[in-house]
């Protein structure tokens, strides 16, 4: 009866939780719907607020645009009025008249400027002509005095010698400076090459250092991962060992219980066998005694055993007892197989742990060796980097000093170029030139400066010559001897016609103008000597002609 009640209650029990779950689901859906409703209400409010803001902004914009339209229409009406149109017409006519007058005056000013420029050119030409005439007149006057000419020639030769010496010194210094500049350029190129080579080496060293750092970081990460794996495996091993110990204890307890049950059942079976043997013996005796009553006795013995077995069972069901016995035997067999499997697993785990420990030791040794190698490589790289940085700093300092000297030379060349008013059109015509002195156009600036110095030296010599001529012209005439009274009766000597030299055609200056490249000391010296030789040959040719003329004149007078 109690079993029936229990069976009736079983189908009713799942209905109660299903209703509760349904109510919970309904409540959850209601909450979700309420939340959605609240969100929809909030979104609607926000949308209404935004739409109202947009409408107000649009109204404001419409209002401002309407005001602007009103202002524009008002301005258009004012502009289109007849009074404003008349004023505009008057202003237009006045402006046109003023522009016409401006153009006329500008044309007049241009014509007057052209006239003034022509007059200035004429004045300059006339002044040049006057200066040339004066120079020719002074030359003619000075040419009549041969002593003065000889003295002047001697002075000019000495001055020319001094100037040539000074010029030679300038050329030697210039050549030395050029050589120094070339040496500095070569040194700069060598330092640049070394700097680039060291920079490339530094970059490669940095790359190798980065690779070594990455490898060391990877090795460190691998070591950390291996250590984490080792720790995890140790924890897992400890957990497995504790679990294994618990399971072994449980199995030992179950095994002890089963052994006790088996021993109890064996004792019971032995008792039953002894009882059956005694019963068999009694039955045999009874069979011998009674003969015919053997079958009844055996049946009675079976009944006695059956009753004893029924006493052993609580419910009085032998089938249930047999099933329980078989189930226990199966459980014991399954536990025995499980214990054997666990033993095998434990052996495998021990082997695996030993293998992992050996692998960990090997990895540690490899990591130690790699760490030592990487440390030694890093030390070598640091030493090399230190050396390369020191060399790079040294080369950079040399490069800075060279650049400073070059900058000083460039600045001095530029200042000298500006002071002596050299013409830089030939350099500026070239592509990429900005008017500044650079490493590329420095020889061109030197050539122009050299040419200008030659011109200045020629002008200086000419100026000194003119000063000497002026000084000699201002000297008073020599004292006349009073005792030479008869000298006044003598016929005065006729003036010697001396052809004045043409000042415009100077062969040396023409040759210097023709030369485009800077001259060496030897070439310039040769040019000056050839010019001096030609001038002396001319003087020698002119002297006998003058002597012949004087002789002929004396003969005529006699």
Swiss-Prot record:
InterPro entries: ODA-DC/CCD, ODAD1_CC. GO terms for cellular component: axoneme. Residues 9-26, 533-551 have a biased composition (Basic and acidic residues). Residues 48-289, 339-416 form a coiled coil. Disulfide bonds: none annotated. Residues 1-26, 531-558 are annotated as: Disordered. The keyword Coiled coil applies. Keywords: Coiled coil, Differentiation, Spermatogenesis. The keyword Zinc-finger does not apply. It comes from the Eukaryota. Pfam families: ODAD1_CC (PF21773). GO terms for biological process: cilium movement; outer dynein arm assembly; spermatid development. Plays a role in spermiogenesis. Involved in the elongation of flagella and the formation of sperm heads. This is Coiled-coil domain-containing protein 63. It comes from Bos taurus.
